[in-house]
Amino acid sequence: MIPGEIRVNAALGDIELNAGRETKTIQVANHGDRPVQVGSHYHFYEVNEALRFARKETLGFRLNIPAGMAVRFEPGQSRTVELVAFAGKREIYGFHGKVMGKLESEKK
């Protein structure tokens, strides 16, 4: 078995990842002089400041790619990525420490 591998009965058909979750598509540009790689579960709002995009719109979202994968942004590169909303308790800790708890939109 490969770490992260999921074995399923082929007769069940394709598995849809993140079914029913809110997604959004954004344009991202690397204005830095070094490549920036973002992992599958990294809170996109808190990625490297060299990446330019509508940051406020990404609060509570991560890349909509399989677990363990990443997207690499080369210097000067611009690309469109799809994001998916975090699920569960919707509490964010770590990364760059910009949230450290419940997402603002859900605080009462």
Curated annotation (Swiss-Prot):
Probable heterotrimer of UreA (gamma), UreB (beta) and UreC (alpha) subunits. Three heterotrimers associate to form the active enzyme. The trimeric urease interacts with an accessory complex composed of UreD, UreF and UreG, which is required for the assembly of the nickel containing metallocenter of UreC. The UreE protein may also play a direct role in nickel transfer to the urease apoprotein. This is Urease subunit beta. It comes from Proteus mirabilis (strain HI4320). GO terms for biological process: urea catabolic process. The keyword Hydrolase applies. Its EC number is 3.5.1.5. GO terms for cellular component: urease complex. One of its GO terms (molecular function) is urease activity. It holds the Pfam family Urease_beta. The gene is ureB. It catalyses: urea + 2 H2O + H(+) = hydrogencarbonate + 2 NH4(+). It comes from the Bacteria.
